[in-house]
């Protein structure tokens, strides 16, 4: 086997491989003989078909099969000989494949980029500093109660947090516009679901009343045809309902999987959950800043093959989240391209930090993270046992711990600035980037 490698770009290689004609022709002949023993053709007894007939009928297709297998096998051997690590599968193109001639083919493929990490000291990280205050717990419990609320129709004037059932019809300069009308729409007043001024204009209205309100679409409204324009809405209120909040009793606590004797114990459990959420949010915010910093300080060309693989994973995840009712390949690749590129770049950069600094997943931290995950379940011991008896599951935790080690390493060199935030602000800042 003869091999030559040409560098066509930073991450693309063109490999020309030659395979002796004797090797290909022998494989073709062997396949023809096997076919002659098993093929059934009209006018011939099984196993008695002349080789000339078999070759005339099946020779071309058999040679194509043999050449395809030879290209795959010799490509893999060539990679090992040349000590090349490809990113994704190659494009294989035969140049010569005639009988009696050496097989020559070209494999075009991408390789993982050589990465020169940027100056980590130029990375800026903003770390939220926050705590769970009593007011935050009050708000959380109020939200939990509203999730479990039953609705009661009332005849009074509507107010914030009521749910109104309305018909509305919008117009601009006297002309109705697409998407500006609905019937039987249920709206929680004060939720911010509608454009500014819409919900406020309904507050104080009663069932059976007809209202007319003037609003202005925000300048950054997603529909450019409506952005910044004044509109008029004619609204009919059909029903006003107020939420009936459940009592804070043991039955209510159990709906959230919490065994608590009284409200004090329930608040303590809610606080623990909120503190866990806050801790994760801070970790996410710091990690997002680290990733942003690595991407900004390091030039990196990513192999298209890896991006395509990640796009397919994202499309499959999206299909699963929405019930698996469609083939993931029906989802446009463009929707996921930027997200896929970020993920691939992040993975390559993290791998480089690990390799250059010989970072490891600390076993004690792996066990600590497993215990932390298990503590959120009713049977934590069973969850721990599950992780310890399932190598793939444990490997995911080890990967997460190794990512944390990368973040910690970068933080040691980066400029870290702490910023005081309220609980809700910190949680919002720590929303993970997909």
Curated annotation (Swiss-Prot):
Catalytic reactions of this protein? [protein]-peptidylproline (omega=180) = [protein]-peptidylproline (omega=0)
Keyword tRNA processing on this protein? Answer: no
GO terms for molecular function, please?
Answer: peptidyl-prolyl cis-trans isomerase activity; protein folding chaperone; ribosome binding
User: In UniProt terms, what function does this protein have?
Assistant: Involved in protein export. Acts as a chaperone by maintaining the newly synthesized protein in an open conformation. Functions as a peptidyl-prolyl cis-trans isomerase.
Record's keyword terms, sorted: Cell cycle, Cell division, Chaperone, Cytoplasm, Isomerase, Rotamase
Q: Which InterPro entries match?
A: PPIase_dom_sf, PPIase_FKBP_dom, Trig_fac, Trigger_fac_C, Trigger_fac_C_sf, Trigger_fac_ribosome-bd_bac, Trigger_fac_ribosome-bd_sf, Trigger_fact/SurA_dom_sf
Could you tell me the EC number(s) of this protein? 5.2.1.8
Q: Its principal location? A: cytoplasm
Transmembrane residue ranges? none
Domain of life, per lineage: Bacteria
* Record-annotated PPIase FKBP-type domain positions: 161-246
One of its Pfam families is Trigger_N
Fill in the domain comment.
Consists of 3 domains; the N-terminus binds the ribosome, the middle domain has PPIase activity, while the C-terminus has intrinsic chaperone activity on its own.
The protein's name is Trigger factor
The region annotated as signal peptide is none
> Entry's PANTHER family?
TRIGGER FACTOR CHAPERONE AND PEPTIDYL-PROLYL CIS/TRANS ISOMERASE, TRIGGER FACTOR-LIKE PROTEIN TIG, CHLOROPLASTIC
Q: Does the keyword Transcription apply?
A: no
* Biological process according to GO: 'de novo' cotranslational protein folding; cell division; chaperone-mediated protein folding; protein transport; protein unfolding
Q: Which GO terms describe its cellular component?
A: cytoplasm
User: EC class of this enzyme?
Assistant: isomerase
Q: Which family does it belong to?
A: Belongs to the FKBP-type PPIase family. Tig subfamily.
The subcellular location is: Cytoplasm
């Amino acid at each position: 086997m003869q091999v030559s490698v040409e560098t066509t770009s930073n991450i693309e290689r063109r490999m020309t491989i030659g395979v002796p004609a004797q090797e290909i022709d022998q494989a073709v002949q062997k396949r023809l003989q096997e076919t002659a023993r098993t093929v059934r053709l009209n006018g011939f007894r099984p196993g008695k078909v002349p080789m000339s007939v078999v070759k005339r009928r099946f020779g071309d297709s058999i040679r194509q099969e043999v050449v395809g297998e030879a290209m795959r096998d010799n490509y893999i051997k060539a990679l090992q000989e040349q000590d090349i690590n490809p990113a994704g599968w190659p494009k294989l193109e035969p140049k010569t494949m005639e009988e009696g001639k050496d097989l020559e083919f070209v494999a075009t493929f991408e390789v993982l980029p050589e990465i020169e990490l940027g100056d980590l000291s130029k990375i800026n990280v903003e770390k939220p500093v926050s705590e769970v205050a009593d007011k935050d717990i009050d708000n959380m419990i109020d939200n939990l109660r509203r999730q479990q609320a039953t609705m009661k129709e009332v005849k009074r004037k509507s107010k914030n947090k009521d749910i109104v059932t309305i018909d509305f019809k919008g117009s601009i300069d006297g002309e109705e516009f697409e998407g500006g009308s609905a019937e039987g729409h249920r709206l929680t007043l004060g939720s911010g679901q509608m454009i500014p001024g819409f919900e406020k204009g309904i507050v104080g209205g009663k069932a059976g009343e007809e209202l007319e309100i003037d609003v202005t679409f925000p300048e950054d409204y997603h529909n450019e045809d409506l952005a910044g324009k004044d509109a008029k809405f004619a609204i009919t209120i059909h029903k006003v309902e107020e939420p009936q909040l459940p009592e804070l009793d043991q039955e209510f606590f159990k709906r959230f999987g919490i065994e608590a004797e009284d409200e004090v114990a329930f608040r303590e459990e809610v606080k623990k959950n909120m503190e866990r959420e806050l801790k994760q949010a801070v970790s996410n915010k710091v990690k997002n800043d680290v990733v942003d910093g690595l991407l900004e300080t390091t030039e990196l060309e990513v192999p298209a093959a890896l991006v395509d693989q990640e796009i397919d994973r994202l499309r499959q995840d999206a299909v699963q989240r929405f019930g698996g009712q469609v083939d993931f390949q029906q989802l446009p690749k463009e929707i996921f391209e930027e997200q896929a590129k970020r993920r691939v770049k992040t993975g390559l950069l993290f791998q480089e930090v690990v390799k250059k600094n010989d970072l490891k997943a600390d076993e004690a931290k792996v066990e600590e993270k497993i215990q932390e995950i298990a503590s959120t379940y009713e049977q934590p011991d069973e969850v721990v046992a599950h992780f310890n008896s399932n190598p793939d599951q444990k490997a995911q935790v080890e990967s997460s711990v190794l990512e944390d080690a990368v973040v910690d390493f970068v933080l040691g060199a980066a400029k870290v600035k702490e910023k005081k935030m309220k609980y809700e602000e910190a949680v919002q800042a720590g929303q993970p980037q997909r």
